[in-house]
Curated annotation (Swiss-Prot):
Residues the entry annotates as binding tRNA: 15, 66, 68, 114
PANTHER family documented for this protein: PEPTIDYL-TRNA HYDROLASE
Name of the protein in its database record: Peptidyl-tRNA hydrolase
Active site: 20
HAMAP family: Pept_tRNA_hydro_bact
Protein family according to the UniProt entry: Belongs to the PTH family.
EC number: 3.1.1.29
One Gene Ontology term from the biological process aspect of the record: protein quality control for misfolded or incompletely synthesized proteins
Length: 189
């Protein structure tokens, strides 16, 4: 069995630590905690790291395309590594959830998220596991684009770091238990 954990974000230092890159932040934390390093795969346009957990190969991926083209990378890697969409988990930001709230889901629509729209369009299904991390709605008068491409303020960054710890625990639990249902029961709340 092989699994792939994908964090969504935009490449480049300009976007580091922005709200839209919270998926990258989560995968960075996982990779660091598991003492794995990323290597750049220019063919697939992604940073990829891997390890074995309970005799299962786990790939950790950060697409180096922009968010709206994440599906190209995900589809190519699923095909290359012969990974089923049932063994895909995507971590990404969610505007409609309070800052720092996390929610695991088995399937669902894109909910307006362009990275998820791209993945659904390229893999042909909405049925893949995901972890959504709340970044909150823009303040009055701020555009959605400026909000998602903005950085977290100090208080929100503290909240996000707590959320990233929870995501780290949830993903590790998921990889040990091999069950999204059990993980959802344990970590959704």
């Amino acid at each position: 069995m092989v699994k792939m954990i994908v964090g969504l974000g935009n490449p480049g230092s300009k976007y580091q630590q922005t709200k839209h890159n919270v998926g990258f932040m989560a995968v960075d934390r996982l990779v660091k905690d598991l003492d794995i390093s990323f290597t750049e795969d220019k063919t697939f346009k992604a940073l990829v790291g891997s390890t074995f957990i309970n005799q299962e190969k786990i790939y950790f991926v950060k697409p180096t395309t922009f968010m709206n083209n994440s599906g190209l990378v995900v589809r190519a890697l699923l095909t290359y590594y012969n990974i089923s969409t049932k063994d895909l988990m995507v971590i990404y930001d969610d505007l409609d959830m309070a800052v720092g709230k996390i929610r695991l889901r088995q399937k669902g629509s894109a909910g307006g998220h362009n990275g998820i729209k791209s993945i659904i369009a390229h893999i042909g299904t909405q049925e893949f596991d995901r972890v959504k991390i709340g970044i909150g709605r823009p303040s009055h008068g701020m555009s959605v684009i400026n909000h998602v491409l903005g950085k977290f303020d100090t208080d929100d960054m503290i909240t996000i770091n707590i959320a990233l710890d929870k995501v780290d625990k949830a993903i590790n639990y998921y990889l040990q238990e091999k069950s999204i249902e059990k993980t959802m029961q344990q970590f959704n709340g």
